[in-house]
Amino acid sequence: MFRATCNTRDFKKVINATSNLVDEICFEVDENGIKASAMDPSHVALVSMEMPKEVFEEYEGDIHDIGIDLEALKKIIARGKGDEKLILDLDVEKNKLNVTFKSNVTRKFSIALYDVSSSNLKVPDIEYPNNVSIKAGAFVEALKDAELVNDHITLKVDEDKFIIYSKGDLNQSETVFDNGIEDDDATLAEFNMGEASRSTFNLAYLKDLTKSTAAEDLLKIYLGSDMPVKIEYEVSGSKLVFLLAPRIES
């Protein structure tokens, strides 16, 4: 069986963040919580989410692989209100996931499931020379600046600085976060540099994977030269991890 009760607002944020990159996913359910990983259709980005049982108000789960249409689930979850309880209930016989919103009124939806098994995708264990922790709001603003210039951006770590750089045929954009300057707002919360590095990425993907963040969310970004960028952040105890392949420059 599988049945879980949680806060609608937090679950909505996790689903929105995941569905920005993939259309369908397999929830791996067991007694410890929910896990899922999937590649985007172009195999450029990987998304992984983990919701331990502790983030739920009530949780009962046996081992199940639940293949779900994320776009359908996202539309249903969007109908939920922040003060409503969200109840997820697996109907094995009918092969459906029941989604119930409960307050003084009870609303129930059912989603047909895909007959799929877990892809066993895992986030690869890569050793990165550099990592930074930065407020999502500041990172997103730098992406907006870069978008004015090009559809690709370069993430650089050099001389105690984290740099977001974009160059077009005529124009360029650069945002520099200097670890050596005192920052009362702590925009750059952590900076660990092992070596200078630079990698270039598709801007649209970076926008998608940060679209559901709040300004004060802390992004942990792992970087190395011509390596995939790994971005992690948490939503009320749930963990989201994104891996994006670099654009290899000739």
Curated annotation (Swiss-Prot):
| Position of the signal peptide | none
Q: Does the keyword Isomerase apply?
A: no
Q: Name one Pfam family in it.
A: PCNA_N
Name of the encoding gene:
pcn
Family per record: Belongs to the PCNA family.
Q: Which UniProt keywords apply?
A: DNA replication, DNA-binding
Spell out the protein name for this chain: DNA polymerase sliding clamp
The protein's job, in short, is: Sliding clamp subunit that acts as a moving platform for DNA processing. Responsible for tethering the catalytic subunit of DNA polymerase and other proteins to DNA during high-speed replication.
Nucleus recorded as keyword:
no
Subunit structure and binding partners: Homotrimer. The subunits circularize to form a toroid; DNA passes through its center. Replication factor C (RFC) is required to load the toroid on the DNA.
Its Gene Ontology biological processes? leading strand elongation; regulation of DNA replication
| Cross-referenced PANTHER family | PROLIFERATING CELL NUCLEAR ANTIGEN
Q: Name one GO molecular function term.
A: DNA polymerase processivity factor activity
